[in-house]
Structure formats: C-alpha cells, structure tokens
C-alpha cells in the first residue's frame, strides 16, 4: 500500500499530498507527530522509548520517542497516534482523548541515506503507567522505559544514539511536565 503524507506550509495549512518516500527525497514540509508515553515511579518519571528497526528506511537502530509517524489525509494527529501505537508496538489502551497535545514545531534535517526530514511535528504525550506491548519487527527492534537521568546521560555522551528529532521532542515534553508540577 502506497503511503501519502500531508504537505503543509510554514503556517501549518494543508496544501496537498505526496507519496511519503518522495516527500522525504525532496525534503518537502509535511505533517507528522511524535508520541511520548511516560509513567510516574517512586524515583520520578520514566519515558517509553523505542529503538527503530534495522529495516527502517531512515534513522534505523536509533532510539526515539514511543512512536512517530504521519497522519493520513483527514485523520487528526491524536487518532493517528492511537493507530500507530497499535501498529508499531501493539499498545491498544491509549485513546485519542488521553493525549495532551503540546503543539508543533518545524524541523529540517539531512538523514544518513540522502533523504531529508522536513516536518511540522506535533508532540503528543500521555501518562500510561500500565501498558503492555507486542513489537512489530518491521518498525521497532526494542522498547524500554528510560529515566530522565538515563536519557540526559545518553544524550550528552552519545547523541547519535537517538533520532534527530528526539532531543527537541524530549526537551519540549520535559518543559511541559516541569511547568505542570
């Protein structure tokens, strides 16, 4: 099945669609979302990170947020987040209305294989203490709960361990969670 992305302008208005790989080859601005699930523990917050599968066409074997993708045409980002949590890691218990939408940011990055990310990326978070998962090996090779301290340590020591968008997503999530407390 051919996948399409929604092309947007700098203000976030939809201006068309394009096949996903072509949009990444041309570096055109398109709609995306990043989901980051977290839980409260006695030692503080933990974040559920996925390691992208070896077979992904970019950012393979990189740690990233819980899931990320592109909404389909006429699909809101919260519904898309719920859909992709199920498709990538088998999580079915998070409903669209459980997400807190932190808004969007635009980033552009050249990737390791000549492709380019240029995304208007919505950040969705949810507090999910009890989730179980079944990994889709075409999407994810590992999934782990990470503490804030472990993420900070790894970001400082080995930033290339993570996808190019993850540090921005993580920083915006932390800012929101620290302001909310």
From Swiss-Prot:
Keywords: Cytoplasm, Isomerase, Isoprene biosynthesis, Magnesium, Manganese, Metal-binding. It is an enzyme of class 5 (isomerase). Binds 1 Mg(2+) ion per subunit. The magnesium ion binds only when substrate is bound. Its EC number is 5.3.3.2. The keyword Cytoplasm applies. Mn(2+) binds at residues 24, 30, 70, 117, 119. Its main location: cytoplasm. It is found in: Cytoplasm. GO terms for biological process: dimethylallyl diphosphate biosynthetic process; isopentenyl diphosphate biosynthetic process. Residues 28-168 form the Nudix hydrolase domain. Its cofactor is Mg(2+); Mn(2+). Pathway: Isoprenoid biosynthesis; dimethylallyl diphosphate biosynthesis; dimethylallyl diphosphate from isopentenyl diphosphate: step 1/1. Mg(2+) binds at residue 88. PROSITE patterns: NUDIX. One of its GO terms (cellular component) is cytoplasm. Disulfide bonds: none annotated. The active site is at 68, 119. One of its GO terms (molecular function) is metal ion binding. It catalyses: isopentenyl diphosphate = dimethylallyl diphosphate. Belongs to the IPP isomerase type 1 family. Catalyzes the 1,3-allylic rearrangement of the homoallylic substrate isopentenyl (IPP) to its highly electrophilic allylic isomer, dimethylallyl diphosphate (DMAPP). HAMAP family: Idi (MF_00202). This is Isopentenyl-diphosphate Delta-isomerase. The lineage of its organism: Bacteria, Pseudomonadati, Pseudomonadota, Gammaproteobacteria, Vibrionales. The gene is idi.
């Amino acid at each position: 099945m051919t996948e399409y992305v929604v092309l947007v302008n700098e203000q976030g208005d939809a201006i068309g669609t394009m096949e996903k790989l072509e949009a990444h080859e041309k570096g055109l601005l398109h709609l995306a979302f990043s989901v980051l699930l977290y839980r409260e523990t006695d030692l503080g917050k933990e974040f559920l990170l996925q390691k992208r599968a070896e077979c992904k066409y970019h950012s393979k074997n990189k740690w990233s947020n819980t899931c990320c993708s592109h909404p389909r045409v006429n699909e809101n980002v919260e519904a898309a987040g719920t859909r992709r949590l199920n498709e990538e890691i088998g999580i079915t218990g998070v409903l669209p209305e459980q997400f807190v939408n932190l808004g969007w940011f635009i980033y552009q990055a050249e990737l390791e294989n000549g492709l380019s990310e240029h995304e208007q990326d919505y950040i969705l978070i949810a507090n999910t203490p009890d989730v179980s998962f079944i990994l889709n090996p075409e999407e994810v090779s590992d999934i782990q709960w990470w503490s804030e301290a472990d993420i900070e340590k790894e970001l400082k020591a080995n930033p290339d361990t993570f996808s190019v968008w993850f540090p921005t997503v993580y920083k915006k999530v932390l800012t929101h969670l620290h302001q909310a407390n």
